[in-house]
A protein has these predicted regions:
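Helix-to-loop junction immediately C-terminal to a conserved catalytic motif
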Residues: 51
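Catalytic Walker B motif of ABC-type/P-loop ATPase nucleotide-binding domains
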Residues: 162-165
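Conserved ABC ATPase signature
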Residues: 137-141, 145
Length: 417
């Protein structure tokens, strides 16, 4: 099973520009989590912080119990071997064919024979649907194939944690769905902890077990998918429905005057874009028939059962419906905790009120209640920022700079064309 990743009080700035502050969450081991947010909210910066490519000013990052912000360079080098990373642009070496791209981490970081390397590479190419394309250069294949090649390379060291940065970037909706299915199947096959950074709504609704959202330098919330997908938080509803009505604007944030003006236009009959509000929970993608049963499903159901009484009422209802409709052959029996679920309400001794986002603080909605999962509704700031671009093309998908031979900072090589 993949390892647990936990961050506590994480704050990152570029100079005087604060990217996000006091971010705390836990990625449950072996589950698929997604981090959402408008463009420029620091989602990719968060990924790079998890593997030590960027160093936050404050906080802790625990990878399998080790704080990578306090460990030695040698320890960090070893911890990075737990990771597989799919960067937004694939980060393939343009001068290498797909076979050599996928083989690169094995040749760079192991002493395996070429026969063993070939066996592993072909296995990962088959898993990602690239058999027959191994001799092609990155410039000769489609964007979707480049994504899958980057994913194959991220898998060759048998990672326990897979970080995926914008898997839908540059892809049409259909290819994005295929990539999403591949990620679910990989989780079923190797039981790795997966974190996907995205602002793709369909992916957000259908893929992850857990969802978080960054906005205005804060983690708005993080928890079981049902919490965010049933949330009445304005920024969450706006984001999930892709509409102009809400606090997100072209410059990341809006003032009250702009929000009032846009609402007046809608009231006058102007279409605000986006889709009609989606009611209820869209079913989560399942592993392809023939792949192993996703063990994460059972672990997650057991975990959310333990915390369900602390969740908003709408999330409780959605979770209970999910438990009631679970295939009996899958994993989990009906809920049997201290509370009881009756006629659309969750009743527990001493807890009769209906939960909503405004009541989170009254439910112990913080680290003490969730074991550092930090399901918090942090206050929003007022000023926006633009996220400085980061060049990933010099890194291989194990989280190393391509070409370095020690735990220090070596030169990047073989940048993709």
């Amino acid at each position: 099973v993949g390892v647990e990743v936990s961050v506590e009080g994480l704050t990152k700035s570029f100079g005087v520009q604060k990217i996000w502050q006091d971010v705390s969450l836990t990625l449950p081991s072996g589950e698929v989590s997604a981090l959402l947010g408008p463009s420029g909210t620091g989602k990719s910066v968060f990924l790079k912080s998890l593997i030590g490519l960027l160093r936050p000013e404050h906080g802790k990052i625990f990878i399998d119990g080790t704080d990578i912000l306090q460990c030695s360079s040698r320890e960090l080098y070893e911890i990075r071997k737990l990771f597989g990373v799919l960067f937004q642009d694939g980060a393939l070496f343009g001068s290498m064919n797909l076979y050599d791209n996928v083989a690169f981490p094995l040749r760079e970081h192991t002493k395996k024979s070429e026969s063993d390397v070939r066996k592993i590479v072909m296995e990962k190419l088959e898993l990602t649907g690239l058999i027959g394309a191994e001799e092609k250069l990155p410039g000769e294949i489609s964007g979707g194939m480049r994504k899958r090649a980057g994913l194959a390379r991220a898998l060759v060291l048998d990672p326990e944690i897979i970080l995926v940065d914008e898997p839908d970037s540059g892809l049409d909706p259909v290819r994005t769905t295929y990539i999403s299915q591949t990620l679910i199947d990989i989780n079923a096959e190797i039981d790795a902890t997966i974190l996907i950074v995205s602002h793709n709504i369909n992916l957000a609704r259908t893929v992850p077990d857990n969802i978080g959202m960054l906005f205005r330098r804060q983690l708005v919330m993080f928890g079981p998918r049902e919490v965010l997908l049933t949330s009445d938080e304005p920024v969450v509803k706006q984001f999930l429905n892709g509409t102009m009505i809400g606090p997100i604007g072209m410059s990341e944030e809006k003032d009250e005057a702009q929000m009032a003006q846009e609402q007046a236009m809608v009231d006058a009959g102007h279409h605000a874009g986006g889709v009609e509000d989606v009611e209820g929970i869209v079913p989560q993608m399942k592993a392809t028939p023939g792949t192993p049963v996703r063990k994460a499903v059972g672990r997650r159901q057991e975990r959310v059962r333990q915390i369900m009484h602390t969740l908003p009422h709408s999330a409780q209802v959605a979770i209970q419906e999910s438990l009631d409709t679970t295939d009996p052959g899958d994993h989990i029996p009906a809920y049997s905790g201290a509370g009881s679920y009756e006629e659309g309400t969750y009743a527990e001794a001493g807890q009769g009120q209906v939960n909503d986002n405004a009541a989170y603080s009254n439910q112990g909605y913080g680290n003490a209640a969730y074991g550092n999962a930090a399901y918090g509704n942090a206050g929003y700031g007022n000023a926006g920022y633009s996220n400085p671009g980061q060049d990933n093309s010099g890194y291989d998908n194990s989280g190393y700079e391509a070409g370095h031979n020690d735990p220090g900072h070596g030169p990047s090589q073989g940048r993709g064309q």
